[in-house]
Design a protein with these regions (language model features):
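A cross-domain feature marking catalytic cores of carbohydrate-active enzymes
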Residues: 12-16, 41-43
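Auxiliary Fe-S-binding modules of radical SAM enzymes
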Residues: 4-7, 26-168
Length: 168
């Protein structure tokens, strides 16, 4: 795709939570970005009646860390080489200034839908299929700008708290 369409003209849709580590999916994001592409992320969401309906959904903390790191890679000059990971491949340091990271989390932008075209961070939620990877009561990719309670829930999920269905 990169050779045919050129830089900034292609992307890859990735599903997080199907057995890969955070490091593995973020290294894939970095390769796509380095080739000139865009990363579009979805959380694994086991659909009732599908062959994978018994698989567990993505861990919320994992999903939020991957969303944040992917946003840094795609839109904020982040690089997976500057991030730190633990022995299980979980992100332990995003490789950016703490104040900048806090401001980015507070903006809510990294946690919005990213499966639709957009080369600027302002355009990442051009999605017309909201709730493609979750239900309206357990939002994984927000199809709208986050408000303070949404950001608070995301922070709790990133801290490992089991915040999910019924909270929103």
């Amino acid at each position: 795709a990169a050779e045919i369409f050129g830089p900034e003209k292609f992307g890859a849709h990735l599903i997080c939570g199907m057995g890969e580590t955070e490091r593995e999916i973020l290294e894939t994001c970095q390769r796509i970005k380095d080739m000139g592409g865009h990363n579009h992320m979805f959380a694994f969401f086991p659909e009732r009646g599908s062959l994978m309906e018994e698989w567990p959904p993505v861990d919320r903390g994992q999903w939020r860390r991957v969303q944040l790191a992917r946003f840094l890679i795609d839109y904020a000059g982040g690089d997976v080489a500057g991030m730190a990971f633990d022995h299980a491949g979980r992100v332990t340091d995003f490789g950016v200034d703490k104040a900048a990271l806090e401001a980015l989390i507070e903006s809510g932008k990294p946690f919005r839908t990213s499966g639709c075209p957009g080369s600027l961070d302002e355009a990442v939620s051009a999605c017309n299929r909201p709730y493609g990877d979750s239900t309206p009561t357990d939002i994984l990719s927000f199809p709208f700008a986050l408000e303070a309670p949404d950001v608070a829930a995301v922070r709790r999920q990133m801290a490992g708290e089991d915040v999910g269905a019924g909270f929103f």
